[in-house]
């Protein structure tokens, strides 16, 4: 078996272009309607297939994340268990995305692990089968596995391909950690946005139902969003803390980035309706 390292598997960030909360289910999960689009800012993963079943992760993050809690290792283990694959893998993570900012980095890392190892191990699961494994690990993982911009419903598992405009975005990552669980448990979170058809949702102004609550509790998010709104239509992604503004050109986005206050961190990225992971899979 080859010891060659398969390099530069991208795990792209996502933006929620809108996020509506339609209700709360008996099991505590929330019914959502949201629009996912990828951006060209990615974590990068390398893989080496091994004959022994051990799974080893190298990362500057791994020292603070228990193996049992790390989505990358859980994803690899889940694929082993689902397929009976007898070997293992050595995995290297280059973390480029902000942690816990609503960009989906952890879910994307897990999805890339499933997609890459399915190919490298030649386990030949379909995307549907990989998405089923991924959904057990996190609600956002299937959209990264399928690799197309999508309108999502339910808890995020029902996906319909869409083609929103591929804007240039200025993404700001405030110095704040927003707990997704705390946001969804907060009694002040709106939970009664009417469910609408996709055509209606795509044609009306977009909003994030979590935004007002998070802005009210996190001054750093409020400050970043307030600054960004001076330059472009802007809102929060996921439950935050990251916010993004839409620009029609890279030049406009970079011009705004150049004016970013010194106490804020941001980057410019391109919207992508086809994930860089799918591009990598089809053009190794």
UniProtKB/Swiss-Prot annotation:
Entry GO MF terms: 4-(cytidine 5'-diphospho)-2-C-methyl-D-erythritol kinase activity; ATP binding
Pathway the protein acts in: Isoprenoid biosynthesis; isopentenyl diphosphate biosynthesis via DXP pathway; isopentenyl diphosphate from 1-deoxy-D-xylulose 5-phosphate: step 3/6
Signal peptide bounds: none
Record has Transferase as a keyword: yes
Presence of the UniProt keyword Kinase in the record: yes
One Pfam family, short name: GHMP_kinases_C
Enzymatic reactions: 4-CDP-2-C-methyl-D-erythritol + ATP = 4-CDP-2-C-methyl-D-erythritol 2-phosphate + ADP + H(+)
Alphabetical UniProt keywords: ATP-binding, Isoprene biosynthesis, Kinase, Nucleotide-binding, Transferase
Catalytic residues of the enzyme: 14, 140
Protein family: Belongs to the GHMP kinase family. IspE subfamily.
Role according to the record: Catalyzes the phosphorylation of the position 2 hydroxy group of 4-diphosphocytidyl-2C-methyl-D-erythritol.
Designated name of the protein: 4-diphosphocytidyl-2-C-methyl-D-erythritol kinase
């Amino acid at each position: 078996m080859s010891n060659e390292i398969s390099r530069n598997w991208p795990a792209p960030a996502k933006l929620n272009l809108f996020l509506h909360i339609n209700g709360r289910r008996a099991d505590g999960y929330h019914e959502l309607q949201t629009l996912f689009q990828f951006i060209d800012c990615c974590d990068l993963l390398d893989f080496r297939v091994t004959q022994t079943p051990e799974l080893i992760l190298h990362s500057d993050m791994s020292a603070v994340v228990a193996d049992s809690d790390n989505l990358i290792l859980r994803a690899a283990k889940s694929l082993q268990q689902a397929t009976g694959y007898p070997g293992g893998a050595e995995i290297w993570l280059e973390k480029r995305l902000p942690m816990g900012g609503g960009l989906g980095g952890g879910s994307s890392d897990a999805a890339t692990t499933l997609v890459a190892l399915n190919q490298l191990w030649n386990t030949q699961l379909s995307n549907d089968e990989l998405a089923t494994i991924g959904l057990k690990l996190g609600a956002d993982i299937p959209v990264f596995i399928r690799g197309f911009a999508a309108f999502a419903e339910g808890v995020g598992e029902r996906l319909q391909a869409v083609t929103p405009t591929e804007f240039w975005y200025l993404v700001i990552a405030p110095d704040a950690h927003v707990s997704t669980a705390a946001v969804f448990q907060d009694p002040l979170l709106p939970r009664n946005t009417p469910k609408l058809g996709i055509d209606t949702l795509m044609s009306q102004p977009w909003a994030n139902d979590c935004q007002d609550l998070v802005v009210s509790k996190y001054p750093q998010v409020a400050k970043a969003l307030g600054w960004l709104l001076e330059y472009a239509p802007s809102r929060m992604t996921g439950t935050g803390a990251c916010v993004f503004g839409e620009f029609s050109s890279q030049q406009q986005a970079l011009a705004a980035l150049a004016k970013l206050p010194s106490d804020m961190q941001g980057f410019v990225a391109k919207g992508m309706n086809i994930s860089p992971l799918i591009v990598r899979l089809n053009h190794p």
